[in-house]
């Protein structure tokens, strides 16, 4: 993997900097590095493809070295270099796609394609110019079974989940009380509602709670907490739990009371915030518990009182809600990230070349299914293909 990264970094620099008119002295170190790459690769043959619709291609390396000059690089010099650069880039692209297409239930962190296995050999260790990539560093740690430390801006750690729970219900569905939520990516929205606006509740207060277990622990998280759940702020028709009917939800939004958010790790509370909105910090957690209340307003203008009568029919439904967004966090497992294209790159390659469903990844790289059942085997393979995708993205956009 280090060799693949070094090759890609060298080729990217060569493509960007070896241009007509450039002073040789400004790129002499890069050209020496480029020549070292050619010397090491010359005389070797590789094969890529042969899985799904990814065609088999054979690669032979027999290229001349780039020479020295006292002046600027001329058109002939650059054209000669371009021929070599484009061949190498095409090779790297195909090695990456071949690797992305493959998976293994055992030791999925290790190279799976024939070409990358060959590049991992001792004879190519001389191609090791720059391994400063975060993904390379973490791939090495994962490969040695050390703790990795991925920093994500918005980690897609929450499988998609959208449902409701009714704490009070009738066959007519005309006086309901409960919670509804949607969890996805890095955001939780939860709403508590009561058709009667807590009229018959103790002290006219309804208590709601929403617990969200994560598939992996997060540390040093920056989180936004808002006293609203905008996805549940408009009328909708909802299928009943048994699927036999539908019921009408027509929310009127109140501000939640006594809001508390707890961040737990292995069942122990690590951080607690009460009635604090905006930006909050969570140190270390694998579970989020949100609790809040709907309080019937003790004083109401006639217009508000008409919204919340003391007896049916209840046309409008009192609703309170919360939104919690994980803006950034550190995770010791590789995850899809809203700010990166790695999952999209991997999925696109596998779809474009009709890669058959293997023993590890779900069909279509379905992220909800993948993260819901996030096994060590999936984590290893995802670490490898994301690393390769990050390398490929240096050359192929």
Swiss-Prot record:
Its localization reads: Virion
Spell out the protein name for this chain. Answer: Intermediate capsid protein VP6
Q: Which GO terms describe its cellular component?
A: viral envelope; viral intermediate capsid
Q: What does this protein do?
A: Intermediate capsid protein that self assembles to form an icosahedral capsid with a T=13 symmetry, which consists of 230 trimers of VP6, with channels at each of its five-fold vertices. This capsid constitutes the middle concentric layer of the viral mature particle. The innermost VP2 capsid and the intermediate VP6 capsid remain intact following cell entry to protect the dsRNA from degradation and to prevent unfavorable antiviral responses in the host cell during all the replication cycle of the virus.
The misc remark on file is: The VP6 trimer contains a zinc ion located at the center of the molecule. The zinc ion is not essential for either trimerization or transcription activity of the DLP. Zinc-depleted VP6 has an increased sensitivity to proteases.
Which family does the UniProt entry place this protein in? Belongs to the rotavirus VP6 family.
GO molecular function terms listed in the Swiss-Prot or TrEMBL record: host cell surface receptor binding; metal ion binding; structural molecule activity
